Amino acid sequence: MTENETFEKVDFHEMELDDEYYDCVFVACDFSKLVIRNTDFEKCEFRACNFTLASFKGALRDVAFADCKMTGADFTDIDRFSDGLVFENSHLDYASFVEARLRKTVFRGCKMYEGYFNDADMAESVFDRCDLERVSFVGTNLEKADFS
């Protein structure tokens, strides 16, 4: 387990991540096209990181993404026990949350052009000041969701 570390400008996109990260900060790191499996992040923060076309298959608990590029990121197979996610001022164009269970997720000031939330459980999530142009919510549980 990696704890209480800060990673700056690390290129992870060709690495094989297989670890648990607790209370870590990632600044301007590149995770593009990475399949993030067998890796859990808890109480971590990602700032200005690149997750273009990354695929999340591990667990994310109490994780914040700020000013990240997440174009085409895939959360479809994210661990079902992931929770406490916050996305702020991030680009999530074409991101897929199909069938993901991410209740109480917070999206603030995010650009989400043509994002896919089909059949996802996004109950009690917040979409505050987000650009939701052409986003698909077919079959999505949006009970008590806030679209302020």
What kind of region is each of these model predictions?
Residues 1-148:
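Tandem repeat scaffolds
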